[in-house]
Amino acid sequence: MRRMKALTAAMTAALLVSGCSTLPSNTDPQVLRSFNADDQSAEVAGPTPGADPDILLRGFFSAAAFPAQQYQASRAYLTEEANRNWDPTATTVVVDRIDLNTQAGATEDERRIVIRGTQVGTLGSGGVYRPENSELVAEIVMRRVDNEWRIDDLPDGVVLERTEMRNHYTPKNVYFFDPSGQVLVGDRRWIHNAVQSLDTTLMSLLVSGPSQYLAPGVVHQLPSGASFVGFSDGAYQFTGLSSMNEEERLSFATQVVWMLAHAEIPGPYAIFADGSPLVADFPVLSIEDVAEFNPEAYTNAVSTLFSLRDGVVSRVSSGTVTPLTGFLGSGDIDSVAISTSANVAAAVRGNESPRLSVGAPEGSYTDVLTADTITRPTFEYAANALWAVADGDTPVRVTRSSTTRELVQTEVEITLPEGVTGAISEFQLSRTGVRAAMIIEGRVYMGVVTRPSPGERGVTNIVEVAPALRETALSLAWRQDGSLLVGTSMPELPIWRVEIDGSGASALPSGNINAPVVSVASSASTIYATDAHALLQLPASDNTIWREVPGLLGVRSAAVVAY
């Protein structure tokens, strides 16, 4: 296996993610059966004899969570004419809840019922979830047939309550490399629990390429004629890969291995292309062969905790707080990002005339940017570059010139959704550097980082991911599992977790924490939040009580988690 190790070593780079902190001054749904056309959903009870129209209609919406055989379970609730005309593949709308209201003018044989709900998302082809925020209103005609109520007229498409989606679909990651080839990026897909061959379903999704949302930020190196032909002779079989070189084959094998492993499909894995092992001389691969690219290695990484108080950054360890020397101990730090692995820090200094400075955590610094306002800095993967937003609307990327070795800055083009205006108050890159999260006028958005040309960056496909928070968001941080931690000004529910695809936002325990939550951070084992009174911590495992951080009791400071 020595040769395999050499190949992976040539592709990888050191894992490095920074910690940061500040104190304020229309697609079709699928069961995703792929190669198993006979997959069946669980047994679904049909219409209850004698059911009233509203009860029958709710049964229809519950049955919509089972799309097998062209929504056969749902069709049992339709009249013959409605069954012929209904196209369930038009779109799958996900709503928070479905409310029913019978319209005036009902007769013994006909009822018109209006359905209403807040549309929170759509579930598209390939199991891709896209967040939405709009009102759904539609009319459904019920008719009595043979003394039983049935649906006689309804809009095309499917409406799912969010709880039904979560009960019957499970999110899995399909992995693609970032443009540098250094890190795997998860592309979240919702796959129906009734699928009988999860591995072949995932393979088909992998070959099909990244979702339209994520595609601008990742690479897909498979030839256009590539296809997955199934699992046979104990191996996953692909065709159309003959033009791929050895490095491309290893990259694809790495995607396959980690996709299957994190879907809890046990290895080792035999992967063949055009009748031969995908990677020459290694017909069977395990996660140990490509361990350098484990996309979840970060979840168990050892971190260092720092605090920011009164402009001074301190190291926090075993209840002891030690102020740093160098520029981070100068007393004028407003916000900071630290990478202990790369021995680099970036800080916004000065309140009246903010400057972005870069240097060793306990050394000297270089000023790289001045502006009226500068957001908390954030590092790309492996600390290859630094980002911050100047004056509320201009993302700036700072990197070291390969020719002069000087620090240079370039503006990043950012494409906001139509109608979205206001200052960007928070901006943070994900661990992979492929996603960006931001707060604009108290609302949380997420976008994809693009590379139009070498040295050039952009942020596109920006969507709001937590509309339930309204305009209350104040702070955010990426968690190790890829979700977002969001601090808010909401008195009852001050801190939230937001899923990476916007499919959900859930409040974290609020015991002993008081809004506003002006700073948040997260390590593999602990969540940190600065509320109205102090810096608090909560174990990432089940717990409901926030406690003060030893060494910082009664102190209102911000946590900085660094790797």
UniProtKB/Swiss-Prot annotation:
<protein>
    <recommendedName>
        <fullName>Lipoprotein LpqB</fullName>
    </recommendedName>
</protein>
<feature type="signal peptide">
    <location>
        <begin position="1"/>
        <end position="19"/>
    </location>
</feature>
<keyword id="KW-0732">Signal</keyword>
<keyword id="KW-1003">Cell membrane</keyword>
<keyword id="KW-0449">Lipoprotein</keyword>
<dbReference type="Pfam" id="PF10647">
    <property type="entry name" value="Gmad1"/>
</dbReference>
<feature type="lipid moiety-binding region" description="S-diacylglycerol cysteine">
    <location>
        <position position="20"/>
    </location>
</feature>
<dbReference type="InterPro" id="IPR019606">
    <property type="entry name" value="GerMN"/>
</dbReference>
<keyword id="KW-0564">Palmitate</keyword>
<comment type="similarity">
    <text>Belongs to the LpqB lipoprotein family.</text>
</comment>
<dbReference type="GO" id="GO:0005886">
    <property type="term" value="C:plasma membrane"/>
</dbReference>
<dbReference type="InterPro" id="IPR018910">
    <property type="entry name" value="Lipoprotein_LpqB_C"/>
</dbReference>
<dbReference type="InterPro" id="IPR023959">
    <property type="entry name" value="Lipoprotein_LpqB"/>
</dbReference>
<feature type="lipid moiety-binding region" description="N-palmitoyl cysteine">
    <location>
        <position position="20"/>
    </location>
</feature>
<keyword id="KW-0472">Membrane</keyword>
